[in-house]
Every structure is written in C-alpha cells, then in structure tokens.
C-alpha cells in the first residue's frame, strides 16, 4: 500500500487522552442512581423553597390586611379624643341656653367659661391658633393675604389680623387671614 492508498477515515493522532468510558453496566447503573439521587435532592430543595415562598406571600398578605384594618380603625376612631374634649363644651352651651332669665353679664361669663373649655380641648389635641401680631413677618405657609395697604409697618409684615388661623401640630388647617403692609406710602 502506498501513501495515497491509506484509508481516509482514520482520525489524526492526538495527545489528549480519550474520555473515560465506564467499563461495565454496573458502573453505568451506579452513576444513574447517583444522578437520580441528586435530582431527587434538588427537587426536594425546590419544593421546600416553593413552600417558603408561599408562606412568605401569605405572611405579607396578612401584614398588608392588618395594616389596612389599623388604618381604617385610626380613621374611624382618630378623632375620638377630640370629640371627648368637645362634649363638655356642648354641655356648657346647652346648660347656658336652658337657664331662664339670664342677665347679659351672666351670659357673657358663661360664654367665657365655655371658650376656656374649648381652648383647653384644642390644646389637649394639639390644635394651635395662628394669630400673628401687627408687625410680624408675613409667612405664606401660615397666613393668607387678603390685601396690601400702605402702612407705618415694614413691607411684607402683618398690618392687621382679620381672622385667626389654626394648625394641628405643624400642619396648617386654616391660614390666618391678614392684611399685609406695603411699607411707607
């Protein structure tokens, strides 16, 4: 045979070792059993993880539902303290109206006592008056300017208070209505 007549299907020689091939059926069955055991372990892990995810979702849903219930209760009963503070004020007004033949002075004293009760109720519930004095700097977060007038007061200060405002804690419920100074005429 010459070099041109050699069979073509022979693979070129390689220095790499041939892949390890299991020699027996028993070895293949042992390897298959090991792979099946790994698969079962992985499936058990996945099932456990899925169970944990379902529990976490259920817990999150329970927390969300409880939070909604708490918010609903807070809205419903949030003014309970304030309402309790106002009941004595209403009682005083009703008692004053029930008195026959009151003098103007007695009526005035009753209104003053009732105003003190109402002011106390406001204070207990953090409702504060916004009543800027003449000459206080105009604050658009606390005051509402109705007009601007020439005044002896410096510009952008309160020239006159028309109506008190109110705030709960640091939140303005109603700004004070004021006339603002435009400065010297």
UniProtKB/Swiss-Prot annotation:
Protein name stated in the entry: Protein GrpE
Location in or out of the cell: Cytoplasm
Family assignment from sequence similarity: Belongs to the GrpE family.
Keyword terms: Chaperone, Cytoplasm, Stress response
Principal cellular location given in the protein's record: cytoplasm
SUPFAM superfamilies listed in its UniProt record: Coiled-coil domain of nucleotide exchange factor GrpE, Head domain of nucleotide exchange factor GrpE
Annotated Gene3D superfamilies: 3.90.20.20, Head domain of nucleotide exchange factor GrpE (2.30.22.10)
Signal peptide residues on this chain, from the entry's feature table: none
Protein encoded by which gene: grpE
Protein function: Participates actively in the response to hyperosmotic and heat shock by preventing the aggregation of stress-denatured proteins, in association with DnaK and GrpE. It is the nucleotide exchange factor for DnaK and may function as a thermosensor. Unfolded proteins bind initially to DnaJ; upon interaction with the DnaJ-bound protein, DnaK hydrolyzes its bound ATP, resulting in the formation of a stable complex. GrpE releases ADP from DnaK; ATP binding to DnaK triggers the release of the substrate protein, thus completing the reaction cycle.
NCBIfam families found in the cross-reference section: PRK14139.1, PRK14140.1, PRK14150.1
Disordered: annotated segments: 1-22
Lineage, broadest ranks: Bacteria, Pseudomonadati, Pseudomonadota, Betaproteobacteria, Burkholderiales
InterPro entries in UniProt: GrpE, GrpE_coiled_coil, GrpE_head
Keyword Transmembrane helix: no
A GO-annotated cellular component: cytosol
One GO process term, biological-process aspect: protein folding
GO function terms (MF aspect): adenyl-nucleotide exchange factor activity; protein homodimerization activity; protein-folding chaperone binding; unfolded protein binding
Subunit structure, as described in the record: Homodimer.
Pfam families the UniProt entry points to: GrpE
């Amino acid at each position: 045979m010459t070099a041109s007549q050699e069979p073509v299907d022979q693979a070129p020689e390689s220095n790499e070792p041939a892949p390890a091939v299991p020699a027996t059926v028993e070895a293949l069955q042992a390897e298959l059993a090991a792979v099946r055991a790994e698969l079962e372990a992985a499936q058990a892990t996945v099932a456990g993880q899925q169970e944990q995810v379902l529990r976490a979702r259920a817990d999150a849903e329970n927390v969300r539902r409880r939070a909604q219930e708490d918010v609903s209760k807070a809205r419903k009963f949030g003014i309970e303290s304030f309402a309790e503070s106002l009941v004595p004020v209403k009682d005083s007004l009703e008692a004053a109206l029930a008195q026959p033949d009151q003098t103007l002075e007695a009526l005035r004293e009753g209104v003053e006592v009732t105003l003190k009760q109402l002011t106390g109720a406001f204070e207990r519930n953090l409702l504060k008056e916004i009543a800027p004095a003449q000459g206080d700097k105009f604050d658009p977060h606390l005051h509402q300017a109705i007009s601007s007038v020439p005044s002896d007061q410096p510009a952008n200060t309160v020239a006159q208070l028309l109506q008190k405002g109110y705030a709960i804690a640091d939140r303005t419920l109603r700004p004070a209505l004021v006339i603002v100074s435009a400065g010297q005429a």
